[in-house]
């Protein structure tokens, strides 16, 4: 049991109830589930709740296309979501829906408190209106020609071709994506939440340590731009909750969606006698509330949500933790390449524990994107889980059953056990701070030690010698005890494996019994715990995902794609003497790390083979620091040092690409050596 039991409520962002879960979504639920399971393993009271986000125009229109009521559609989707989550071993304490009585009641209560306190304003606005469907059109339901690059069939708020953002009224030849009709402008009175009234409180809150520094920095930019009143209403027809005392007006989905956290917890409290809703959500609550979210919804969770809670007299979250996106094989998930993988497609072909481990091995507390490299995925799972972890038991358990009656020996030399147990607080701290990758590396380093011990001791040789039977018994028992400790450390990540190991060892794996003496303890006969990942299974997933595209994809509009030379024409000629002034050198990236004060920069220590230079490079959007260390690259070595507010930059690394994720540093041939001049 933990020294001081904590009361914790943890949430993941609510999946939208108009489609299936994919592997990008699963990152967040796996990350949160690991954290929740860890808290419970340590003896804390922890409740992991979630719900389907079930309101909005997209759901209303999709249900119409299917010829069913929205309520029927969201019920079907919720059933599919719950099955996917359960099969991925996501252990919610409650999974509900925002379209619920609890959420309707709480959303109305929050709104009325905000209204009565003077935080709700009204304003008449003009919007595009579909005259055939008699409905106002959200930006994404208006299409037309981009006013900048003239590409056709672009959305009402941004262009996929050139990346421009604009107002729907700027579109050329706009049309309704619902009916195809030409929209008209129409006035309507809307309700606004007075977000600027909470600016002082929000500035204090975001700098209180409740957010990652990267998030706090980003929010600081929004304050510089000035907070705006937030439109919280939508006009009928709309699938959602009607606003109290305002017929024909509905809550915008982003108002009742975060209240859905409270609604799901309220539903759980109604099912149980030992839970009190107010103990977690009242202004003076001492419980902890944590939200795990994607970086794309930081604005809603770190500005609107805490301001709404403050205005309604409720407590704010203890912390909001954001993560990055998932890429596959170094690129955005793609339906045409078969890398836009649904959770169910994965589950039809591979063990969910594989992905849980791979994500854990690459997750940190930062907001970096995570790349699911499918070859690396197979190699890492096969090496770490099958080759190191499970192999430890498979090499030794048979001897215990066949030669020693299935009973473990009293271990004379406990030095290895002591060294493994000495890591428990280090590993626990990594879990607590969401540094799962560091935890996995620590655990696998222990697995290497345990396997080396077995290899050096060679019980398969000892067992052949009559006078070495006790020594063989000791080695195998010691190995299985180390295996037990390792699986206990991994239990939040690999719950199904832990369950199978508990059946094999005939004991529960808990943090409290890590140091238990197993002398004389009887184990069951060993059965295979995990199979290797075969590339044919991965190939089957990719092929199945391509087939999904053929069934569901909409016809794509051909776009004129400019070549790199067209986008970035060659500059004016320079003389050879001008070029000769630039000293390009091979450098090895000795160290790479984040710059807390900057959103786009990484700090690099570049080894020139006898001299080290510090460079601040704007490549954070494309690279995680750990992926750069050890790589060779090319740098401008004689660039004048530049004083920046976080240090001096002594050069520049070379990279190609338009920017963002599409940026690649120059990597010379492996025969090149640090310090060599590029000629």
Swiss-Prot record:
Q: Name one GO biological process term.
A: methionyl-tRNA aminoacylation
What keywords would UniProt list here?
Aminoacyl-tRNA synthetase, ATP-binding, Cytoplasm, Ligase, Metal-binding, Nucleotide-binding, Protein biosynthesis, RNA-binding, tRNA-binding, Zinc
The entry's cellular-component GO terms read: cytosol
Where does it mainly reside?
A: cytoplasm
How the cofactor is bound: the record states:
Binds 1 zinc ion per subunit.
Location of motif 'HIGH' region in this chain is 15-25
- Binding-site positions, ATP: 335
Q: Motif 'KMSKS' region: where?
A: 332-336
Tell me where in this chain the tRNA-binding domain is found.
578-679
Which proteins does it associate with, and in what oligomeric form? Homodimer.
Tell me what this protein is called: Methionine--tRNA ligase
What is the organism lineage in this UniProt record? Bacteria, Pseudomonadati, Pseudomonadota, Gammaproteobacteria, Alteromonadales
